[in-house]
Amino acid sequence: MLVAEGGANILLELDHRGVLYRCNVRDKSLKVNNEYTYKNYRYINQVVRPLLGDCIPEMELVDIPYDRISGIIGDFVGDPDSDHVSALTIKNLRPTNVYGEKIRYDDHFTKVYHDDTMEHILVEIKPKWLHHAKFCRNCTHNNLKNRKIPYCYALMVVDPSHVSDMLLHTGIAFPRKFLIKFVDYFSKSDNILAKLHDIQKNLDSNVSMNDIKSIDDVSDAFLLNMTLKDVSCFIEWTREPDSLEVNVVDVDMKLVSKLDHWVNTHIQLSNSSNLVHH
């Protein structure tokens, strides 16, 4: 069963053991996608996991017979040039038997899910650019796209109390126990936003977008930084035993083919007359 699809990947549920299969469909060639998946698996484990540790969920590299999922994968790729589809297994971080199908809140940066009794609450965030020396990249981009979002994850790094503004903006009557736990987590110096910010800042000191003049200027550090500026964080609260679990996904190896898009967006934002500073 197809669970979700994005620009480059699809998520499949093939059994009922709480595991999803993440298949790359960027290219029409199965062989090309399989090669990327193998490289990406090594990249996640050798490059990203050492930076974020236990926040990266465990993954397994598997090969699925093409015939088993041809009815699904065939809609995304061309004629099969491989007898298998390479995939990464990952824990289902939003099981429908807990959260159902309904999204309780949804904007460009945040989604909220919860069960009917609010025993389980899941906040999915895309913090994006947490470090940018010249201006707030997230808020400036919001202005450019006319997105009316009154909170900013980059601001939460310097003012953790701002997390309350985000929660209030959702309009959800969260349990007090959840609010205390959630706000307390983001007040700690090792919360996931602080970690991502510090890594982004360190990588920016090596090479920033302003340094990129051509493809020859693109380094592994730059591509890693672009990966970390596009992750998703799943923060799940369970009433009993009043615990938070944080998982970071979408940590795929970025391809240099995106360079023109990144540079053009950066130029457009830098030339904006409506820059935002925090």
Curated annotation (Swiss-Prot):
One of the record's GO cellular component terms: nucleus
EC number, UniProt record: 2.7.1.158
GO biological process: inositol phosphate biosynthetic process; nuclear-transcribed mRNA catabolic process, non-stop decay
Molecular function terms from GO: ATP binding; inositol-1,3,4,5,6-pentakisphosphate 2-kinase activity
Entry's localization field: Nucleus
UniProt keywords, alphabetically: ATP-binding, Kinase, Nucleotide-binding, Nucleus, Transferase
Reaction(s) catalysed by this chain's protein: 1D-myo-inositol 1,3,4,5,6-pentakisphosphate + ATP = 1D-myo-inositol hexakisphosphate + ADP + H(+)
Lineage: superkingdom: Eukaryota
Residue positions of motif EXKPK motif: 124-128
Biological function: Has kinase activity and phosphorylates inositol-1,3,4,5,6-pentakisphosphate (Ins(1,3,4,5,6)P5) to produce 1,2,3,4,5,6-hexakisphosphate (InsP6), also known as phytate.
Protein family according to the UniProt entry: Belongs to the IPK1 type 1 family.
Domain comment as written in the entry: The EXKPK motif is conserved in inositol-pentakisphosphate 2-kinases of both family 1 and 2.
Protein name: Inositol-pentakisphosphate 2-kinase
Organism: Candida glabrata (strain ATCC 2001 / BCRC 20586 / JCM 3761 / NBRC 0622 / NRRL Y-65 / CBS 138)
